[in-house]
From Swiss-Prot:
Biased composition (Polar residues): 952-970
Lineage: Eukaryota, Metazoa, Chordata, Craniata, Vertebrata
Membrane topology: Single-pass type I membrane protein
Protein name: Transmembrane protein 132E
Chief localization: membrane
Family to which this protein belongs: Belongs to the TMEM132 family.
Gene behind the chain: tmem132e
A single BP term in Gene Ontology: detection of mechanical stimulus involved in sensory perception of sound
Transmembrane region(s): 900-920
Protein function: Required for normal inner ear hair cell function and hearing.
Domain of life: Eukaryota
């Protein structure tokens, strides 16, 4: 009876549960039936693909400039990109004019020139109307030691980084003021930068008071070397600084060459900061000239001046005896080359007698000097004794300088101690001019070695000038010799006119040296050499390329036939009409850092621009990019990786100089997997805006920010598209990366009064033309398979999307306001994609397609338009053109709701199974209509009525002890009444009683003599008993009665008092059934 109540209320229960499930699902699911897949929530384990405005950036009017990329990765969860914006950092190293940044996207281009203030924030070399971004003033001290006998300070200034062929601004160069400080005293002078080298020599005469008595006199050098002086006591230091200032009204510096220092009258103090040059040492002059000693043997040595000689000058050379020597006589032979004449020889000691004889030849002159000690004359044996003085004359010559040699030989005439057999040679330098020093000047002080990447030599011109005592500056570049200190860092040309790198260098240096020599003088040229860090960092936008489901492309002759699959089980791979599935493509970017070693010799690496920046060198090495296995992939447009067939390979950057040398590489694979297009994001672009600004935190770098505009402000104005394709493997790529021959892009307008869509012959994609004002998702774009790959029954649409369009005509002021608003990006752009089906075999990480709003604007996922699906595909189309959706991670709320929903579904399923089992059992227990011969099972019938029963109670049921579960006894116990119904139905009952399946009637076990434990006795334990009404025309009904407890529950629950009430209740049950 209870089962009937549940069965009758089952539809109401199912409807209630259904309503509850729909309400719960509506709270956690989007309103659109497809939005659950099209707008997933952000995943906690994967970030969305980075998108940007796919515009092309270029730098022009530069000699050396790079785009940059920051090493610092964006913080987790931050907005990684915007499809209508793109920012690129860049740096300009060398330029002759103001650089310009160009951006282009489709038919739109935008150029902007960098302002001088942006490129050159502040510089003391600022010249009105001229660009001096690379200019640097360099200063060289001619002599670091100044003697009181010649207290002249000379400093050479020149501008490095300036083009030496630029003669237009020589008259606009500034003045340089030299400051000399000793304690609190200061003197200064000025000179004007001029000439093609933009150089000048500043000279200062130091006051004699600066050379005080505290300075120790010079000592003599006892060694024959020329490395330096052995000075006694401490020396005084003078600090040198410089400032820049403009010329006066007379185009002069005001302090041409003031001797004895001091500012000019009426001159104001310099407002420029003092820039340090270095320091010089002051020395008190001695009574003797600066000389050098040259040892002849263990007994005798020569003393001669160290300075260069002038033509016609007389040279005095002294011969001395070492202390405690026992030599008493010797013969000195002097052999001099042509140009050096021995004028005279005289004794310098009263202890020695000197005689000499001269013999002149064509090439040489030989003098023989006899020296003997005078007996009886005593002297100081503890000190050195000057024996004689030899005077030589330097003849005139025509060259700039010459070197004269004199050979010395001592003969003791057989007396002890014996003489040394080796001859001693002294070299004398004779110069036409009194040159103080030579100074190498390079046009720039730094070399960025891009030759390692390109194979093209990078060279810097070099000039060498000589500085004379009188202040003359002479170019001696054609007469110098040169040599690189380390050719693994920098090299120098054979003519010494430039230094260069050719790509074979292995390292850099902060002080790379090239030595230049001129006559007896030499000087180093110091440079900073930057080299790229190897291996290069080769980046791919996607290093795992897969098939794109549903996108078929023609097999061109240059495409690999291996892409054609013969697998008949995979219909999407089967090729018909010469077509195959498209592969994903990847964008290539090559990055590096330029670095050098420190000047301290510790091999500490110093990175150009700091460790936070990487330099984009893709344009430099794009000709050296190569795929190792060309069958797997190839390059398109030199920077796009195109897959050809399955496999793994390496993309490498080959060295342009060394065979089989690799500068950098990265691995990639073309896998036998399929990804689907989960979103086609399309934006209408009506123009481009470009903004240039300095990079925050770095004064050398700048940022170019491009923004795509959306508003159409004039009639017939055209707009193009910016399209990104999102894949189910959590990657995205601009559609412009793919060949336009591999797809068709069609656009339609929902309102031709606002915009129309037309295909221009010169344009890759359709264009939007403004016809009237309006806003909304007016344009619908479909991406279809190329015509050669379409099938007659195959749906060719790969993906589709609605495009947000805004047309507003107005004045120029309104347009400027729109530009400002569009710079902040319109957040109402939709992203719709056609997705016919879901393939559970292809999966990937979740992504966040709607990443278009700024961080401060929340995203309303429920406002996305419904998915465009204009026609229902056939079963064959769905099977062939099936799309894949990317599984995504769910939030905790969704996991909980879906778990609860699953429990409800499981409970409903269990309930339905229980009902089905019950119905099946119930149908098997029905009594067939009258006339049916037999039944499969025997039943015991309980008669309710006023007539006599067919059998007695003992015949209808077994004894209680034999069958405790006797059904009739259960009725007696429950109802406490007679076993007769209120109607006369004896005949009817008798006609409805049938025998058992074995042919016997339903009697007790006693009548048949069966044992209670026999298998047949179990057939008497009937669960259901059927009662029939007296009229045979009425349909029969059955009453299920389970056991005694069930019957007691039904009787007590219904509260029947007599048999009439029970009969009425049974009639109602029949009507309900």
């Amino acid at each position: 009876m209870g089962h009937f109540v549940v069965q009758g209320d089952l539809p109401w229960i199912l409807c209630s549960l259904r309503l509850v499930i729909m309400i719960i699902a509506g709270k956690v699911s989007p309103t659109s039936s497809d939005a659950l897949f099209s707008v997933p929530v952000p995943s906690a384990t994967s970030s969305p693909p980075e998108v940007y405005l796919p515009a092309t950036f270029k730098l022009s009017n530069t000699q050396l400039a790079f785009f940059l990329q920051e090493n610092r990765a964006p913080s987790y969860g931050s907005q990684r990109g915007h499809p209508l914006q793109r920012s690129e950092s860049f740096v300009v190293f060398q330029t002759k004019e103001l650089p310009a940044v160009n951006i282009s996207l489709g038919p739109f281009t935008q150029d902007q020139t960098l302002s001088k203030d942006l490129l050159q924030p502040s510089s003391p070399l600022d010249i009105p109307g001229r660009l001096t971004v690379n200019w640097k003033v360099r200063a060289f001290i001619v002599q670091s030691r100044v003697y009181a006998s010649n207290p002249l300070v000379q400093v050479l200034f020149y501008i490095a980084g300036r083009d030496w062929d630029d003669f237009k601004i020589q008259d606009k160069l500034p003045c340089v003021r030299l400051h000399a400080f000793r304690d609190v005293r200061e003197i200064k002078t000025s000179c004007r930068l001029q000439g093609n080298l933009a150089q000048c020599l500043a000279q200062l005469d130091l006051p004699s008071t600066w050379f005080n008595v505290n300075v120790a006199p010079l000592g003599r050098r006892k060694s024959s070397g020329t490395d330096g002086l052995e000075l006694t006591g401490e020396t005084l230091q003078v600090e040198l600084y410089y400032t820049l200032h403009d010329p006066d009204s007379n185009d002069e510096c005001g302090e041409s060459y003031p001797r004895r220092g001091g500012p000019s009258r009426g001159e104001s103090l310099s407002q420029q900061p003092l820039l340090r040059i270095g320091s010089i040492s002051l020395y008190q002059p001695s009574q003797e000239q600066l000389v050098v000693d040259k040892q002849l043997d263990k007994n005798l040595f020569l003393r001669l001046p160290e300075r260069p000689l002038k033509p016609g000058e007389t040279l005095n050379i002294y011969l001395l005896l070492v202390p405690n020597s026992t030599v008493e006589q010797f013969t000195l032979k002097v052999k001099a080359k042509k140009g050096v004449n021995l004028l005279s020889t005289k004794s310098r000691s009263n202890q020695w007698r000197v005689e000499w004889d001269m013999q002149s030849g064509a090439k040489h002159s030989i003098a023989t000097v006899e020296a003997s000690k005078i007996k009886g004359v005593s002297g100081d044996m503890a000190g050195s004794i000057e024996i004689m003085q030899l005077d030589f004359e330097m003849e005139n010559f025509t060259s700039q300088s010459v070197t004269r040699r004199i050979n010395w030989n001592i003969d003791y005439r057989g007396q002890n101690p014996t003489s040394d057999a080796e001859k001693v040679v002294t070299e004398l330098t004779v110069v036409q001019k009194d040159i103080q020093a030579i100074i190498p000047l390079s046009m720039d002080t730094e070399i960025i070695n891009t030759a390692v990447l390109t194979g093209r030599t990078v060279a810097i011109p070099v000039k060498v000038v000589s500085i004379e005592l009188n202040g003359a500056v002479t170019d001696v570049s054609s007469s110098v010799q040169c040599k690189s200190f380390n050719e693994d860092i920098v090299k120098v040309s054979m003519n010494c006119d430039y230094v260069f790198v050719n790509g074979k260098e292995t390292r850099g240096s902060m002080n790379a040296r090239v030595i230049f020599s001129y006559e007896h003088l030499s000087a180093p040229l110091e440079l900073t050499v930057w080299v790229p860090k190897l291996p290069l960092k080769v980046e791919l936008s996607d290093n795992r390329l897969s098939f794109i489901k549903g996108w078929r492309v023609p097999i061109l002759p240059d495409r690999r036939t291996a892409r054609d699959s013969d697998d008949d089980d995979d219909d999407d791979r089967k090729v018909s009409r010469g077509c195959t599935l498209q592969y994903q493509r990847a964008q290539i970017k090559v990055l590096t850092q330029f670095h050098t070693t420190s000047s301290e010799g510790t091999n500490q690496m110093i990175t150009m621009l700091g460790p936070d920046w990487q330099v984009d060198v893709t344009e430099l090495v794009q000709d050296s990019l190569k795929v190792v296995d060309g069958r797997v992939a190839e390059l398109a447009d030199r920077t796009v990786l195109v897959a050809n067939e399955l496999g793994s390979s390496t993309l490498k950057v080959e060295s342009p100089l060394a065979v089989e040398a690799v500068l950098g590489e990265t691995q990639f694979s073309v896998v036998d997997e399929k990804v689907s297009i989960v979103e086609l994001r399309v934006h209408a672009i009506s123009g481009l805006a470009l903004n240039l600004q300095p990079s925050p935190g770095n004064s050398h770098t700048m940022v170019a920010k491009a923004t795509g505009l959306q508003t159409l402000s004039t009639l017939k104005q055209e707009a193009s598209f910016s399209i990104w394709v999102y894949y189910s493997d959590n990657t995205a790529a601009p559609l412009s990366m793919y060949d336009p021959k591999d797809y068709n892009l069609n656009g339609t307008s929902a309102d031709d009064k606002v915009v129309t869509v037309a295909q221009q012959p010169q344009q890759r994609w359709p264009v939007i033309i403004a016809e009237g004002e309006g806003t909304g998702d007016i344009v619908h774009v479909e991406m279809t398979i190329s015509e050669t790959c379409q099938k007659t029954k195959r749906k060719s649409v790969i993906a589709s999307s609605s495009v947000f369009v805004k047309v507003r005509f107005g004045t120029d002021e309104d347009s400027e306001e729109d530009m400002e608003m569009e710079t902040e990006i319109d957040t109402r752009m939709p992203a719709n994609t056609r997705r016919p089906a879901i393939d559970s075999n292809v999966g990937g990480a979740g992504y966040e397609p709607s990443n278009e709003q700024p961080a401060s604007v929340p995203i309303d996922y429920t406002n996305f338009p419904t998915i465009s699906n204009p026609e229902e595909p056939t079963e064959e189309d769905e099977e062939d053109d099936e799309f894949v959706h990317s599984p995504r991670s769910m939030t905790d709320l969704e996991i909980g709701m879906y778990a609860l929903l699953g429990v409800f579904c499981l409970a409903i399923l269990v309930f339905l199974i229980n009902c089905i089992v019950f119905v099946l059992k119930y149908r098997h227990k029905r009594i067939p209509p009258e006339g049916q011969a037999n039944m499969d099972h025997s039943h015991h019938w309980v008669f309710l009525g006023n007539g006599e029963p067919l059998r007695t109670q003992s015949d209808l049921s077994p004894q209680t002890v034999e069958s405790p579960s006797n059904t009739l006894e259960g009725v007696q116990t429950c109802c406490h009444g007679d076993h007769h119904s209120s109607g006369s139905s004896q005949t009817s009952v008798q006609s409805q009683v049938h025998g058992r399946g074995d042919g016997s009637s339903g009697g007790s076990t006693k009548d048949h003599g069966e044992d209670a434990s026999s298998p047949t006795s179990k057939r008497k334990r009937v669960k259901f008993t059927t009662f029939t009404l007296p009229t045979e025309d009425l349909p029969y009904n059955s009453i299920p009665i389970a056991n005694e407890e069930d019957i007691q529950w039904v009787c007590q629950d219904m509260g029947f008092q007599d048999q009439e009430e029970l009969h009425d209740y049974m009639r109602r049950i029949k009507e309900i059934a």
